Amino acid sequence: MVQAPMISVPLKATSEIDWVAPLKNYIRNTYGDDPERYAEECATLNRLRQDMRGAGKDSTSGRDLLYRYYGQLELLDLRFPVDEKNIKISFTWFDAFTHKPTAQYSLAFEKASIIFNISAVLSCHAAHQLRTEEAGLKTAYHSFQASAGMFTYINENFLHAPSSDLSRETVKTLISIMLAQAQEVFLEKQIADQKKNGLLAKLSSQAAALYAQAVEGVQENVTKAIFEKVWLSVVQIKLNFMNSLAQYYQALADEDANSYGVAIARLEIAQGLAKEANKMAHSFPTSVPPNSNLTSDCGHILADATKRHLATVKEKLEELNKENDMIYHQPVPAEASVAPVPKLPAAKPIPVSELYAGQDIQRITGPDLFAKIVPLAVTESASLYDEEKAKLVRAETERVETANSEMAASLDYLRLPGALQVLKGGFDQDILPDEDFRTWCVDVADHESPHRIFEYLHTEKQAISTILDKSSRQLDMEESVCEKMRSKYDAEWTQQPSSRLTTTLRTDIRRYREALEVAAKSDGQLATKLRANETELDEMRQAAQHGEIDELFQRAVRKSRKSNPNSPATVEPNLLEADFDDGGPSVVEQIQKVEDILKKLSLVKKERLQVLQDLKQKAHSDDISQILILNKKSIANYEQQLFQQELEKFRPHQNRLVQASHKQAALMRELTVTFNNLLQDKRVRADQSRYESVQRSRTSVINKYKRAYQEFLDLEAGLQSAKNWYKDMRQEAESLEKNVEAFVNNRRAEGAQLLNQIEQDRAANKSSHAALEQERLKNLMERMSMDPSPTSPKPSSGSGGRPTPAPLSFAPAAVSNTPLSAYQKSNFSTQYPASPPATQVPHNPGGQQQTPYQQYNPSSLGRIPGPASPPPNQTSFNIGPGRHPASPPPTQTSFAQSRPYSLTTYGNPSALNPQGGQPQQSQPGGYVPPGFVPPPPPPGPPPLGPQQTVHYGGNEYYAGAMGNPNIGRPGSGQQGPQGQQGGWGQPPPQQQLYQQQGGGGGDPWAGLSAWK
């Protein structure tokens, strides 16, 4: 049997476009991303459009190509605004019927054209199916409905059609045609299955109604020269044919109902409609336009179908007329009075969402090409959703923590499960400390022994005392030598008294000694604290070192119990072994029941924590960005509704947590009742005193060692502070020692120069006096001579006949060639070169702050007074306003005013600089007290000839007196510093070095080391 021809819609054609460049520009300008990262995605989208242009119109592959491109356009529209203002791409499509081109920049136009082609492909695919086979018939039935659904989507979503094929009137006509053909296909299946006549009549009536709607639209579009005229002929023929079928099958149904008169009337109507259809089919053109998608034999097929149907109707009409005339004699109603045939719809438009029902849409459309690009609006919505998730997780976490806290508090109140150990008799055998006790022991063992620290402190204190004693002796020795030289030379010894210059140094020494005394008292307090807790600390240290912490705790508890007079003296029998038979449950059974409930509670807690963990993990991995992107256009209207809908996925976890809380409450009530019954048992009450005694002993032991540990922490802090203090104090003492040595060395050098000056002055005086006496003797001899001398000098006027003595000269003849001419400068403080000794480092007294001390107070961690001393590289000593100038060190060029000095404490650096750390300003010209006249500079030594040596006996005495008063004196048998015999004829080592350098022409301090 030849199947009836079906109308299929032609496809729209389009011109080529380029997606790549516009998309890359937009990604660069709007999203600020590198467009080359999306080069492959842009090329893929471009290739999809090329493939879509060549899609086959009668296959599922062509449909899938179109739908894949359309799906990517939908996803693209959520991220990229393709229009005339943003991504400007001209889409050119040709009308499917008139072939007129239409160009727009709107992505909606592109999508509507794609959907139109999908509908056209579906209609072509349905029209070409072999409906004589069941599979082909089902495919045609589904495809016609799907085509109608796609046309319906265009009609509902694209209101302003730019071309005639997309206009609402045209699309509605196409919907009617597709639905009518789907109804016809379904009718063919029912006729082939020989269904009841009444059903077939209703299906035919519905098909006729759909064709009637199509005729109206096709007639209008033919008038507008949009559709081909052959389409109007086909729908008109099928309209009459379907109406004739409806009347025919309804007549058969009336015959079955013994309504022969009505049946005859319907057959007469069917005969007239069949004749009209056959007439139109015979007038169908033999050649059809290519754009109509109809075959050339379409007219012959329709003519044959209508002819066969007309013959069938005529035959049945003759049969019924004969039977009615002979048997039934029922009246035949008029055509106008015949009731219309009821309609039964069997076809409806399939929505786009159901087009691929039962299939993997992701497989057809492919992955989202631009999934890595998330619009800002979607990101903001995703952040809001994340906050909603966080609120939910926080609420459930708080609920779980509350439930766990309630369980812990209840068990702690009931003293479970620890109380069960007592009842089972295992408490004495396994008394274990808590983790805090173990931590205390390990911490005590990890620290350095306090005894070693005390030994270190004692050693440091002795060393500091030795340094202070040495410095004090040096100052005393220097002062003693200075005063001895003053006593020997009287007014000629013009060196300043040492007592006026060593006030600051001696004050530092005194204050350092006082600070050591205060520190010793603090050390004593620390030692007292150690002795008070030494036993407990030693026990804790040894237990941690030997891994016997548990044994220590158990011994301490047993010892505490023995020393407690209120504790039971004898061990009571084990409750599990006691024999009480009062007819009730045994203690073992009651304990077992309590343990079972505790196990159930533990499982509830474990399950609750696991559910919470699963909830957190699921919430963390939950990402609805794609859902938000798909709903981007409508998210503003129902954002909260969407969030609540998505949060429902966590509802099962929430319900499980609520159930766990209810189960815990029930188990806690059961546990309370069961455990109270156990405690009320007379066999259990007999053991209460023993349990309480153990608890008291355990608490007492923990408190004792806790107190010892706290004292240990205080002791350790005090000892560490003391170590730091003694370390800083030793540095200060060593700095003071170097300052004292520098002072003494400077005083020695100053004394040596002064001694040289005195010796030179005395030698000059002796030489002048001898010359004067010789002149006087010569004059006397001349007067006593009997021979007059013509060369006798004339007496000087105004001299009374007495010759004028030669003036005294204190300068040697060759002194003008020596570098000692620098001594003629009047400023005493600047007549020494600025070359520091080997042991002295240049120092800026105003620009360097001393290192702050560590705090040290073992008893209260407070501060204990302690002194401060200038650093070892200090080059000036502070003097008060009423003091005489001090002898400067070799590199000092000025004196600095003293600053207030107060006794400091351990770790108090501010005491060293009471003025807020501001450096003291030195006086460039040096400080000279009123009435002080510096001594005159010593003259240089006389010129030396080859192998000539000049001896100054006085220097030996001064050099020896600094170490031993007997060294260097005339007649003394002791040797000098270099092992030579002391005497007036041998210069000291410094004088030898001075002579070797040409009378001090090099460095006048070169012999300083000899005076140390």
From Swiss-Prot:
PROSITE patterns: BRO1 (PS51180). GO terms for cellular component: endosome. Residues 844-857, 914-930 have a biased composition (Low complexity). The keyword Amino-acid biosynthesis does not apply. Residues 558-578, 784-812, 827-1012 are annotated as: Disordered. Keywords: Coiled coil, Cytoplasm, Endosome, Protein transport, Transport. Residues 301-330, 719-775 form a coiled coil. It is found in: Cytoplasm; Endosome. PANTHER family: PCD6 INTERACTING PROTEIN-RELATED, TYROSINE-PROTEIN PHOSPHATASE NON-RECEPTOR TYPE 23. This is Vacuolar protein-sorting protein bro-1. The gene is bro-1.
